[in-house]
Every structure is written in C-alpha cells, then in structure tokens.
C-alpha cells in the first residue's frame, strides 16, 4: 500500500454509504516554519524539505532588504528600520501563507524578530526604548491577526557552528557580525523556545547533524519531522 493511499472504512447505515479516512488526509493546508539563529541552516533546510515533501517554500526576504548592509555597518542607526521592514515582510508572508491554503515550509518566523532580535538590540543599547516599544506594539497588533505555524522546527546550534556556517556561505554584510552578538541571540532563542506554547515544536541539534552535506543526517531530520507531522491532526 502506498504511503499516501487513503484508507476507507465503509459502514452502511439506512442504505447510506459512509466513508471515513484519517483526519491527516483531510487537511490540504499545513504551515511548517523553520526557526534558528543566523547561520543555523534555515534556508538550506527549507529548500531540502520543500523538495522532499513537495511543499511550497517561503524564504526570508534578506537579500532584498534595503537596510541590511547599512544595519551591519551601523546597528544603532538602522536597527529600528531593519526590524520594522522584517516585521512587515513576515506579516505579509504569513497572510499570504494562510490565504493560499497549501502545505508550506517557511524560512524564519514572525516571532523571532519580536522575541529575539529586537529585544536583543534594545538590551545592547542599539535600539532606543521609544523605538523598541513602538516596534513591539506593532508586533502585538500583527500577532493578534495571524495564527501560529502548525509546527516550528528550531535549529539549535553553538556559536562555533554558527560562525563556521556563516563563513562558509560568505555573505559580505555578515563579515562584521561579532561573536558576542551571536551568543546573545542564542541565549534569547533558548529563552523563547523554553516558553513557546503556540503549537508543536521540534528541536534539531545542528552540532550533531549536517543535513546540508549528509543524506543520512537529512534522513534523520525527515524521520523526526514525519513523526511530528503525522501526529499533527490526530
């Protein structure tokens, strides 16, 4: 029997034939999101999962962000502009995902900017309290209008692993990222993940798996996802 085959139970009641099938197959829509620090492999895993599952990928709008290069040159000056751009971009993306009614895998969530990047910039003195409060009130409004992903896959990685992967992909604007900046982000990611209750959560330890180069490691991740996805709609 093929994996995607439907299983039907036929029950005759008052000459009426009733068909039953698992709820998982009733769901045409599913929203999976990949979360993780800079260099954790979100975009790579998004592409690999989209190819494997035939899901529609939605990528982070990083390369087209008009503030990104300026931000890494002068974080204090451009932090608010950058975060508002990302927030607006991701809000529009989530709206599009929910209206599309497809199985989607998304590169980065709307929550990461609000609970990790923006408060980290504020704590480091790189975003004023006025700008941060303005930003967060805007996020809360947008958050009230969107639904959480059905499953978040969090890519956990140590700072050395992040640095290695950042250097490997060789983006010029990331050359100035400091180690303490990545460390602070990691700490905030862990704090957020331990309190996340918006939906299902799967944690993948990137220090232990290399899904970008190892088919065996990718297979491990896929099996972990299968176990979660198959239980989403029970």
Describe every region a protein language model picked out:
Residues 42:
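Conserved lysine of the Walker
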Residues 115-190:
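A glycine- and Lys/Arg-enriched "phosphate-lid" helix/loop adjacent to the NTP-binding pocket
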Residues 51-89:
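Conserved substrate/cofactor phosphate-moiety recognition/catalytic segment
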Residues 13-26:
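Short, positively charged and aromatic/hydrophobic N-terminal segments
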Residues 163-234:
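NTP-dependent small-molecule kinase module
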Residues 37:
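P-loop (Walker A) phosphate-binding loop of NTP-binding proteins
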Residues 34:
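Hydrophobic anchor at the beta1->P-loop junction of P-loop NTPases
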